[in-house]
Amino acid sequence: MINESYRIVITGYSGFLGKNLMERFNNSEFLLIGRDHKEIERIEDFNPDFIFHFGAEIYNQEDMLDSNIIFTYKILESIKDIDFKAFIYCGSSSEYGLKSLPMKEIDLLEPRNMYEATKGSCTLICQAYAKMYNKPIGIVRPFSVYGRYEKEHRFIPTLFRKFEERSEITISPGYHDFVHIDDFIDGVLCFCFSTTDKIKGEIINLGYGKQYSNYEVYEIFCEVFGYNIGLNRIDSLMRDFDNNNWISDIKKAKDLYNYSPKYDLKMGIKQIYDERNNR
C-alpha cells in the first residue's frame, strides 16, 4: 500500500487494472474520468500528482479512433501546462505484432488490427508530448496480466470456473507471457516514482519474462487443484492474435526501474486459488 496522500487522475478506473491500482493508493484523492470528453476539463483544476491513463476501447472498432487516440490527445493537451510527478499511459504488448524473439521496447511496431494500431499511435503521441513539453510522460506495456477483478470470460478465470465445476474445458493453441496483477502494479509504481528523466518518453515492458502454452496452463491448474478435468483440445484452431512466441524482454524494467516480478505462473495460480477458497 502507498500510505502517502496523492491527488490522482485515473481513466479505466472500473476495469481490471484500474481497480487494482486504486487499491494501492489507499489514502489518496481520486478524480475518476469516464468516457465523456467533457470530464477532461476537470483535470487542470484538480492539480494532480499522478495521471494514470488506463482506459481504452477494446472491442468496438468504430469507437477506437475517438475513445483511444482522440481521448488520449485531449488528456495530454489538458496537462501540458501543469506540473505533475508522472503521467503513465497503459499501452499493450499487442502493439508489437508478431515477433520471433522476446519483445523489446525498441522493436518495430507491427499492428495487425485497429486496436493494436490505435494503442501504438497513442504510445507515439505520448512520447511526442513528453519531448515537446519536457514532461514525465511514460508508457507501460503489459503482457498477459491475470488476477483479482479479471473479467470472467478470460482464460484464467474460465479455467478456475471449469475446475471448480469439474466440467470439461475446450482449449485452443496459444502462448502467453502471464504476469500476476500484483507484479504488474508493482512495476507501474516503480516506474511512476522514478525521476522525470527516467520517465520522459520511456516505455517499459511489464511481463514475467517466460511464456506458457495454453496446454501448460491447464497442467498447472491440474497440479494446483489436485485433479484433472476433461480437456477438449482443438489444435487446429489458431486465432489471428495467437502466436507461437509471446514473451517479454523485461531487462530494461529490471535494470533501470528495479522491477522484480515475484510470482511465476504456478505461484500466482496458487495464490488466487487460496484467495478464492478463503472468501
In which residue ranges do the predicted regions lie?
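N-terminal Rossmann NAD(P)H-binding glycine-rich loop of SDR-like oxidoreductase domains
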Residues: I2, Y6-N26
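SDR active-site strand-loop-helix element
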Residues: T11, I51-G55, F87-S93, V140-P142
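NAD(P)H-binding glycine-rich loop region in Rossmannoid oxidoreductase-like domains
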Residues: E39-I70
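Conserved catalytic-core motifs of eukaryotic protein kinase domains, centered on the activation segment
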Residues: N60-L65, L98-P102, K151-E152
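Conserved Rossmann-fold NAD(P)-dependent oxidoreductase catalytic core, especially the SDR/UDP-sugar
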Residues: K74-M114
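Active-site helix of classical SDR
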Residues: M114, T118-C122
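NAD(P)-dependent short-chain dehydrogenase/reductase
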Residues: L124-C190, Y218-F225
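C-terminal substrate-binding subdomain of Rossmann-fold SDR/epimerase-dehydratase oxidoreductases
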Residues: S167-R279
